[in-house]
């Protein structure tokens, strides 16, 4: 059974639109936990467009489940993580011009730099996950980097047409299998909604789904605690069995 991590970045986006103090991600993290969230995820971007350093500091003190800090693989962010000591760090690609994270890390081309950062973080007792596309070469490079986890990018699945979605699902299923055979633990996220989450939650070996935008959108109608509860029910007991089909992309 997959667990549920709730991403609070969009709460901070609303706050930063007016540069004010509300809505407060720290307060809403508590409501998410009361709704059944198994963890809280925030992305501290280099441009600080939504989550701020102070948010992360306060969340570290108040989160009672798990705190997953998404961040770019930079010296500045590694130093912050070593100070804050979240329960997990997820290294993600970052571009200043993007609206949201657009794809997975290219671990293959960044292997040397990533190995050093991963060693620093895990040497301090902070498990590291790499946000990657479900491609064999990236998974193999992730394993060689020393990371203990990967988070599979589900954006292509979420954005696929009805006819293409089973093929994208098959890539995620096979990517999960490949990662586990390499000794990696597996999470997933990006673009998941109440309508498409169940096949991903049903994948054997999938440990946690990180979901934000769709939950915040529903929270506007039903409140955050209820929105999290509804998503938790889908993730905990998915009704749909996964489909099987296409092979891994970018075979090495």
Curated annotation (Swiss-Prot):
Enzyme Commission code(s) on record: 2.6.99.2
Pfam families documented for this protein: PdxJ
CDD domains the record matches: PNPsynthase
Pathway field: Cofactor biosynthesis; pyridoxine 5'-phosphate biosynthesis; pyridoxine 5'-phosphate from D-erythrose 4-phosphate: step 5/5
Biological process, per Gene Ontology: pyridoxine biosynthetic process
Superkingdom per UniProt: Bacteria
Location in the cell: Cytoplasm
Keyword Transferase: yes
Positions with a binding annotation for 3-amino-2-oxopropyl phosphate: 7, 18, 191, 212-213
Quaternary structure note: Homooctamer; tetramer of dimers.
HAMAP family, sorted: PdxJ
Function: Catalyzes the complicated ring closure reaction between the two acyclic compounds 1-deoxy-D-xylulose-5-phosphate (DXP) and 3-amino-2-oxopropyl phosphate (1-amino-acetone-3-phosphate or AAP) to form pyridoxine 5'-phosphate (PNP) and inorganic phosphate.
Record's protein name: Pyridoxine 5'-phosphate synthase
Classification lineage: Bacteria, Bacillati, Cyanobacteriota, Cyanophyceae, Synechococcales
Designated gene of the protein: pdxJ
